[in-house]
Swiss-Prot record:
Its main location: secreted. This is Insulin-related peptide 4. The keyword Cell cycle does not apply. DAGWWLTRGAARSLGGVR-amide: Expressed in corpora cardiaca (CC), corpora allata (CA), antennal lobe (AL) and gnathal ganglion (GNG) (at protein level). Expression in CC and CA detected in most animals, in AL and GNG in few animals (at protein level). GO terms for molecular function: hormone activity. The lineage of its organism: Eukaryota, Metazoa, Ecdysozoa, Arthropoda, Hexapoda. GO terms for biological process: neuropeptide signaling pathway. The keyword Flavoprotein does not apply. Keywords: Amidation, Cleavage on pair of basic residues, Neuropeptide, Pyrrolidone carboxylic acid, Secreted, Signal. It is found in: Secreted. CDD domains: IlGF_insulin_bombyxin_like.
Length: 88
């Protein structure tokens, strides 16, 4: 019984890790929310937070601002989580 449970857990873990590495297409709001969740955590995207960023949050965007090609990378073709993380 314990051996069956252990094998089942190992198979489930490997299936979940493969699903995360799978390339997917992200566009528009879904792309921006996914990137924000990966870079700054799941609680970083809030609708009621207001339009203005705090001074520290605005400064943290300085390195990301100049990068181009995210929409091409993940909307025109599928991208992986690792590719999304490279834009953080």
């Amino acid at each position: 019984m314990k051996l069956t449970l252990i094998i089942l857990l190992v198979v489930a873990y490997s299936w979940c890790s493969e699903a995360q590495n799978e390339a997917r297409v992200f566009c528009g709001r879904v792309l921006s929310e996914r990137l924000a969740a990966l870079c700054w955590g799941p609680n970083s995207v809030k609708r009621d937070a207001g339009w203005w960023l705090t001074r520290g949050a605005a400064r943290s965007l300085g390195g990301v601002r100049g990068k181009r090609g995210l929409a091409t990378e993940c909307c025109d073709k599928a991208c992986t989580v690792e590719e999304l993380l490279s834009y953080c």
